[in-house]
């Protein structure tokens, strides 16, 4: 009995819900019935005749004023829509329609059934979006003196923006300074040098820091006992001063490498000394952390110098040793430098081994990780891939894996293919990048374009398949396929990171919504009608009357019906009816 009662209540509840769904139709017919019953007391016929009389007495000036007012309102709507679209990237009318009107009209979001699951991951999604909008240090950044400045001397253009250089200054202050720097004169000078905006002032401060160490040694050595002379001789010079000179004063990579080797000697001594004292207090621990950052930075830049000078195997060995010695320092992303060097050696098995370690779901992705994985998958099938053959026989398993890897990479950063396919010109990469943005695409393609060209057919496979990614993610700002939705903040940050002479890639490409185009057309059409009616009222009246007569004529209706039937016959391929033949006896 209880089950029967429960079933009856469920049926009654469903009937009530169904009746409320179609209740508006009942109300509509009730209103029509009431209007019909009350047509005599409400004097509807008299009111209609009064309205028709009023419309007949209107002059052309009224219609001119009406069309002018409508065009003015349409123009204001157009201006507001354009401003809203430029600021927020979406149409105001479309947003209101989707967000507010569709639920009132009974529209249901496709993801409403998954609200419980999505609500649990809101915090993870927010954290992911914040991390994707974070600006990262470019692991493959160039040398200012030996590369960026040479570009400026040749072209007269500044490849780095003030925002990018300011971020680098903040990084240098974070990595190369600590609270105890004021106790050592050379480090105190370098602490101020990293905050200098003028490059010449920074270089002068670095030279001053090195000179202070020389003067200090010459003055103090004769004044102390012989037992302490050995300790002062072991006192290292200022490693950060050599770093600054190697980065900004050296005009060639060879000069930068020499300065970095001097910095390595100084930095290694500081690191060993602070390593022994790191447990003596928080001050010594901070100093050891700073010396560790300095040593890792120097070794990484030395490996990059060897890579630039053609000693790729030596660079690979230095990077592997550095990753083994300091496995927890992932902030420098040394594995991306290692991947690029291994690709230059065409050591694809070693590249796959590095990817197996770093292409993990728990680790942050990058364009280097995703596109290198796609390159390895494409390398297995690209030499024999043909779009015509694939369309006839279908994709094999290996080809499907390669296409899926390309789609995954394009979803992560959709700007890269245009640079790899040379559909857009490259510029020097910035010192900082935004993941999934145009800056990261430039940094990746600048160093990896040669590796894609070296693999036969890889660019052809990329050209044939990369645009298919966008069919899987029609609304990339709202929902992704393998990654989180594409962050909206990339365009603004990329414009600050990239120079003004570069046209920043925007994804998804902003197209004018239909509402803006419709409003613009309506505004222009009504304004033109108002102008013609004002200038030629009699002629426009004759034209309007003629158009009304044409549309209301029987010939127009017959012609319209015939054209409709002809279209239906063409679409259905209906053969024409055979003509009857008359025989005479």
Curated annotation (Swiss-Prot):
The chain crosses the membrane at residues 15-35, 62-82, 512-532. It is a multi-pass membrane protein. It comes from the Eukaryota. The modification Phosphoserine is found at residue 386. Glycans are attached at residue 47. Keywords: Glycoprotein, Membrane, Phosphoprotein, Transmembrane, Transmembrane helix. The keyword Magnesium does not apply. One of its GO terms (cellular component) is membrane. Pfam families: ST7. It is found in: Membrane. Belongs to the ST7 family. PANTHER family: SUPPRESSION OF TUMORIGENICITY 7, SUPPRESSOR OF TUMORIGENICITY 7 PROTEIN. This is Suppressor of tumorigenicity 7 protein. It comes from Loxodonta africana. The gene is ST7.
């Amino acid at each position: 009995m209880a089950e029967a009662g429960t079933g009856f209540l469920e049926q009654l509840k469903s009937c009530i819900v169904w009746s409320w769904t179609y209740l508006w139709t009942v109300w509509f017919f009730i209103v029509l019935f009431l209007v019909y019953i009350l047509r005599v007391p409400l004097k509807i016929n008299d009111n209609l005749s009064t309205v028709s009389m009023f419309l007949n007495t209107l002059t052309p000036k009224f219609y001119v004023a009406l069309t002018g007012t409508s065009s003015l309102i349409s123009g204001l709507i157009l201006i507001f829509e354009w401003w809203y679209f430029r600021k927020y990237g979406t149409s105001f009318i479309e947003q209101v329609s989707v967000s507010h009107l569709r639920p009132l009209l009974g529209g249901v979001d496709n993801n409403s059934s998954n609200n419980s699951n999505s609500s649990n991951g809101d915090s993870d999604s927010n954290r992911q979006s914040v991390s994707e909008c974070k600006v990262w240090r470019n692991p493959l950044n160039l040398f200012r003196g030996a590369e960026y400045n040479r570009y400026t001397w040749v072209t007269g253009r500044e490849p780095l923006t003030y925002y990018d250089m300011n971020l680098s200054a903040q990084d240098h202050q974070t990595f190369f300074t600590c609270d105890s720097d004021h106790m050592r004169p050379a480090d105190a000078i370098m602490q101020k040098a990293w905050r200098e905006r003028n490059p010449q002032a920074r270089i002068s401060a670095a030279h001053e820091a090195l000179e202070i160490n020389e003067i200090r040694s010459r003055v103090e050595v004769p004044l102390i006992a012989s037992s302490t002379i050995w300790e002062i001789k072991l006192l290292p010079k200022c490693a950060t001063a050599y770093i600054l000179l190697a980065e900004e004063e050296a005009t060639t990579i060879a000069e930068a490498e020499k300065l970095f080797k001097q910095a390595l000697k100084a930095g290694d001594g500081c690191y060993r000394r602070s390593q022994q004292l790191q447990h003596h207090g928080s001050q010594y621990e901070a100093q050891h952390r700073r010396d560790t950052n300095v040593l890792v930075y120097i070794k990484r830049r030395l490996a990059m110098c060897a890579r630039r000078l053609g000693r790729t195997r030596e660079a690979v060995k230095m990077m592997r040793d550095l990753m083994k010695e300091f496995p927890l320092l992932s902030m420098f992303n040394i594995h991306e430098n290692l991947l690029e060097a291994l690709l230059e050696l065409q050591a694809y098995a070693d590249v796959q081994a590095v990817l197996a370690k770093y292409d993990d779901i728990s680790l942050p992705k990058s364009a280097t990780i995703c596109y290198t994985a796609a390159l390895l998958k494409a390398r297995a099938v690209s030499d024999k891939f043909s779009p015509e053959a694939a369309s006839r026989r279908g994709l094999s398993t290996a080809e499907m894996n390669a296409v899926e890897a390309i789609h995954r990479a394009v979803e992560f950063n959709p700007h890269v293919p245009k640079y790899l396919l040379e559909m857009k010109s490259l510029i020097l990469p910035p010192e900082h990048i935004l993941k999934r943005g145009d800056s990261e695409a430039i940094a990746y393609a600048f160093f990896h374009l040669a590796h894609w060209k070296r693999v036969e057919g890889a660019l052809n496979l990329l050209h044939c398949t990369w645009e298919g990614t966008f069919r899987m993610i029609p609304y990339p700002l709202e929902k992704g396929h393998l990654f989180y939705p594409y962050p909206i903040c990339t365009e603004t940050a990329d414009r600050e990171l990239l120079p003004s002479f570069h046209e920043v890639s925007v994804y998804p490409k902003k197209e004018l919504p239909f509402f803006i185009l419709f409003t613009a057309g309506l505004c222009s059409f009504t304004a033109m009608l108002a102008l013609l009616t004002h200038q030629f009222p009699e002629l426009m009246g004759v034209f309007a009357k003629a158009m009304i007569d044409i549309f209301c004529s029987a010939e127009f209706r017959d012609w319209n019906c015939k054209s409709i039937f002809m279209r239906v016959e063409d679409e259905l391929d209906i053969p024409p009816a055979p003509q009857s033949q008359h025989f005479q006896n």
